[in-house]
Amino acid sequence: MLSGNAKHPHPDVHAGTAAGRQDEPAPGPAAAQHLDVLVVGAGLSGICAGYHLQTSCPGKTYAILEGRDAIGGTWDLFRYPGVRSDSDMYTLGFSFRPWRSEKSIADGDAILEYIRGTAKEFGIERHIRFGHRVLRASWSSETARWTVDATVGPQGTPARFTCSFLYLCSGYYDYADGYMPGWPGMERFNGRVVHPQHWPADLAYDGKRVVVIGSGATAVTLLPAMAQRAAHVTMLQRSPTYVVARPSSDPVSAWLQRRLPASMAHRATRWKNVLLGMYFYNLSRKKPDLVKSKILKGVRAQLGPDYDIDKHFTPSYKPWDQRLCLVPDSDLFKSIRSGKASVVTDQIESFTETGLLLRSGERLDADVIVTATGLQLKVAGGMKLEVDGTRMNPAQAFMYKGMMYSDMPNLAVAMGYVNASWTLKAELSSTYVCRLINHMDAKGHAWCAPRRTDPASDEEPSLSLRSGYVQRASNILPKQGSRRPWKVHQNYLFDLMALKFGKVEDSEMAFGRAGTAASVDG
């Protein structure tokens, strides 16, 4: 069974996964420190995991390893102007710590403060070890433990941990590098080129001409934020994205908070937003033409009949083939109407000394060019995974219940939804991890491992979006099956029933004791 020591809990550890090269030499010998559960990553998912572990598995020792020097994950990394959530905070926030602000669409600083405040309020901070970059994890069926190797600090000091259960909460973004296409003539440009993922603190753009390359969530966030200080901001896009305006405050939530206790008002608002989001997504899939017409009608209402909506705001794909872009309080459209910002739909021929030459022959002069061209994905944070000496490739694995890899024992992954707030699924995953750990203890099992009993069944990519960052990573992403529990459902109600209330044991989950092989050939 999984070990635990309620009398002498081990201080939590916070570490992150490898962000750079994946072929570093193994750390030198070091005394391994054992924990019942090792969590990797201290963003939204990691803090959520810490809360559920200490609440539902109070006798277990756990630690959180964080590769960076601060709590917050994505929300500590991204510092570009206007950074904000495109999900409401009643669902992006935790169920156990209600969001109190009237603004439901929060800026990055408010979200970061919320995550830090949660870690402090529930004593999760003391379980975090910063500057721990995880390189590899090796499972031994003989001991029923993972051995996790990491480096610490700028000197890369070796550190080793063992754990009975490994929970990866590091997301799927590559923190080290964003996606940057190579354009001809970039070296000729006399201005400054920046990527939003690594925003320079010294960038001055007051009164300057700015071109933002891209049309996704980052680009539509940057345009209105930078337009407040720049002389003019142009969003250059190769093709349009669906853009939906929404108030940053939730009037229904405000009404409920005036009439109900705070916790009850939060739950009601959370469920209202969950159900409305599911309804809109399902309507988009079943009646895409209807949803498309309503979205474009909203854009025309913002920009007027003379604006070329067809060229600049009408995508060639259906709603939710890619994520929709949310603009709070119509800020993007207000910037365009004011003349401080504009949208150009074209392709880059080359950089020039003064800006960009487009395929159409048009030139865009710029002092600053921002490449909001997307993210790169990194599965399991780039760490190496081994089971009984065999290298495991997540791209060859299937997702079990959307949160575990096939044939990898005592390992779970916190993943969010592509069509709803990340935290909704991450919190359900943490709930299930705790249920699984407690079940193994009750039954005397040392390990569990998802096993596909019908390998010939259909397979599909685990992420079905057509977004560029997903398509670029198609060769590294795990797979999903066509039937449960191997089907990844982008549906909160379905996952709620499966992960919080469903059976832990099924025909696709194997259990065993230490000394019995958990590897696929065992």
Tell me the role of every PLM-derived stretch.
Residues 2-15, 32-40, 44-128, 237-238, ...:
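Beta1-alpha1 glycine-rich phosphate/pyrophosphate-binding loop at the start
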Residues 85-105, 135-137, 173, 178, ...:
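Catalytic cores of eukaryotic secretory-pathway lumenal/extracellular enzymes that build
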Residues 99-117, 129, 213, 283-292, ...:
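Short beta-strand to alpha-helix junction loop
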Residues 103-174, 350:
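Feature captures the FAD/FMN-dependent oxidoreductase FAD-binding
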Residues 287, 295-354, 358-384, 459-522:
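C-terminal catalytic lobe of FAD-dependent flavoproteins
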